[in-house]
Regions:
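Intramembrane alpha-helical segments
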Residues: 2-9, 74-155, 159
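C-terminal ends of transmembrane helices
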Residues: 63, 116-129, 176, 243-252
């Protein structure tokens, strides 16, 4: 039973649950909850791709995880690298086959864009200053566009996708700040490993301010109403301001670790802002 749990842990079950719920919320925003088949297929595709990417990333991150995440299943030896690689391939295949049940545009986004981008990122772009962070953010943003394509409403998901991109980019950057020691030892050329914590904190502050201002733009231009603003301020704007003031005071690795988790929460709440606005109106 323990062995089974370690293999499940490899896939990051909490992340998978979050991605499944995100697809449900996306469907709700597009008034598509009654389209059960499309909803279930989009959930399974996103979960399969997410799980596969998590397993494959752990394979590629083995050396850095020895320092940064010593309790991960591959590092502890509870899951073999060959097995993790096989699981990743299997899940990528299952997700791709399931995508064939959806529209041509959804198939292209999943198989033609998301899948190769995830593999190229893990093999070649991880640790590349800023580009690696941007690619991860693009992959997450594509999940929202994929959902929109599946339901025939890509336009509806463009703004949520942009917000998800911004928050994910910042989270990945802050996570690199938290992992600066392990990344430096492994020779990864991340932005924080290259320029240090102080300069990285300044970049994070500027990014947080830009993302915070950008998130207000849809409300100020009348795309969304007061419900969107209220949820956005509570779950996104306030956490971003916390990052700004904390990093202005004294940037530390422990702070970065904490804020990377806060930003994961903010990404979910940001999506809920669109859901609440749609539901209340």
């Amino acid at each position: 039973m323990k062995m089974l749990w370690h293999h499940i842990e490899l896939l990051r079950p909490l992340n998978l649950l979050t991605s499944a719920l995100a697809m449900v919320v996306c469907a709700s925003i597009m008034d598509g909850l009654h389209e059960t088949k499309i909803l279930l297929v989009t959930i399974f595709v996103v979960v399969c791709y997410n799980a596969a990417a998590n397993a494959y990333n752990d394979v590629m991150d083995y050396k850095t995880d020895v320092v940064n995440r010593p309790r991960r299943p591959l590092v502890t030896g509870q899951v073999k690298i060959k097995m993790a690689r096989a699981i990743a391939i299997l899940l990528f295949v299952i997700g791709s086959v399931l995508t064939l049940e959806l529209s041509k545009s959804a198939q292209f986004i999943a198989i033609g864009l998301a899948l190769p981008t995830m593999i190229i990122y893990s093999k070649f772009l991880k640790g590349t200053p800023l580009i690696g962070n941007a690619v991860v953010a693009i992959i997450l943003g594509l999940a929202f566009i994929f959902s929109g394509a599946a339901f025939g409403q890509i336009e509806t998901m463009i703004i949520p996708s942009c917000l998800a991109f911004g928050l994910t980019f910042l989270r990945e950057f802050v996570k690199d700040m938290a992992d600066i020691e392990g990344d430096s030892k492994a020779g990864l050329n991340t932005f924080p490993a290259k320029v240090g914590l102080e300069k990285s904190a300044k970049f994070a502050i500027v990014s947080a301010l830009i993302i915070g201002a950008g998130a207000l733009f849809p409300y100020l231009n009348g795309y969304y109403d007061i419900p969107y603003l209220v949820v956005l301020v509570l779950g996104v704007e306030i956490p971003l301001l916390m990052i700004v003031f904390s990093f202005l005071k004294s940037p530390e690795i422990d702070q970065a670790k904490r804020f990377s988790e806060v930003l994961k929460f903010s990404t979910i709440v940001g999506l809920m802002a669109f859901f609440v606005d749609n539901y209340v109106r």
